């Protein structure tokens, strides 16, 4: 999963897709933090990666709801666009 995110970051840079790039860089940051956590042995299982992705998607949706409540639809739209990118990596439900 980590390698897929890294290669998709390169593709987003080449395509100059700023929203996708921001979302994927955020995901990679959390993956690196999980890999370097004490006891992680510099590894990240797919199960742990999916938990991180689900957490980030939920946080993004919650943040967007707060933005809407504060009449900041522009920020909510940006946040929801990033959530959509993250949800591409989650299994379909």
Task: Annotate the PLM regions.
Residues 1-93:
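Charged, compositionally biased, marginally structured helical/coil segments
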């Amino acid at each position: 999963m980590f390698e897929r995110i890294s290669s998709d970051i390169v593709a987003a840079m080449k395509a100059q897709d700023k929203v996708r790039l921001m979302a994927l860089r955020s995901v990679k940051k959390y993956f690196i933090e999980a890999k370097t956590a004490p006891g992680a042995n510099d590894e990240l299982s797919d199960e742990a990666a999916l938990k991180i992705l689900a957490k980030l998607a939920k946080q993004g949706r919650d943040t967007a709801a707060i933005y809407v409540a504060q009449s900041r639809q522009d920020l909510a739209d940006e946040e929801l666009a990033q959530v959509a990118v993250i949800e591409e990596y989650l299994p379909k439900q």
